Design a protein with these regions (language model features):
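ALDH superfamily catalytic-core signature
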Residues: 1-62, 83-89
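Conserved C-terminal structural/oligomerization subdomain of aldehyde/semialdehyde dehydrogenase
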Residues: 45-167
């Protein structure tokens, strides 16, 4: 509901859409790595305990929409778009707002669509049909070098664009 979105946003970032000074919203570190159920409870609403992900409808990407920020939790911003072109644009905006050069994921059947997505989104790792969190760190789902340190290349002002490892 709208009320739950406001509660969630204020718990996670201290601000919600329309709040004064919303552009200065900051992620609450205590929620990192917590379950969806725990986060909802802290925010002040109930969801089933076995809920894996909280999906939150958003209208825009940027500082006025705190839920569009990086969340490091099982909370996803969801954008309704009319076609793949608009979807690619939203994905590009998310990467540019939250981590230029880092990673982006797409799930589709067509190689041409994945290629078009990769050309639009400024990310060093385009993860295709793999879980994005674990796909980005490599090894299990793809041939990326296993690492928890991921370079962002020149997009992110890094000297390294790949996964950094001692291997």
């Amino acid at each position: 509901t709208k009320e739950e979105k406001i509660k969630l946003s204020r718990y996670m970032f201290g601000k919600a859409v329309g709040d004064e000074d919303v552009e200065n919203a900051r992620l609450q570190p205590a929620l990192v790595g917590q379950s969806a159920y725990w986060i909802a409870k802290q925010a002040g609403f109930e969801i089933p305990e076995d809920t894996s992900i909280i999906c939150v409808p958003c209208k825009e990407v940027g500082p006025k929409e705190p839920i569009s920020r990086e969340k490091l939790s099982p909370v996803l911003a969801v954008f309704k778009v009319k076609d793949d072109k608009e979807g690619f644009q939203k994905a590009a905006e998310m990467v540019e707002f939250n981590g230029l050069g880092h990673s982006a994921a797409i799930h589709c059947k067509e190689q041409a669509m994945a290629d078009a997505y990769g050309e639009k989104v400024k990310a060093m790792r385009i993860i295709w049909n793999s879980p994005s969190t674990f796909g980005g760190i490599g090894n299990v789902y793809n041939s990326f070098l296993p690492s928890l340190t991921l370079g962002c290349g020149s997009y992110g002002r890094n000297s390294i664009g790949g996964n950094v490892s001692a291997v």
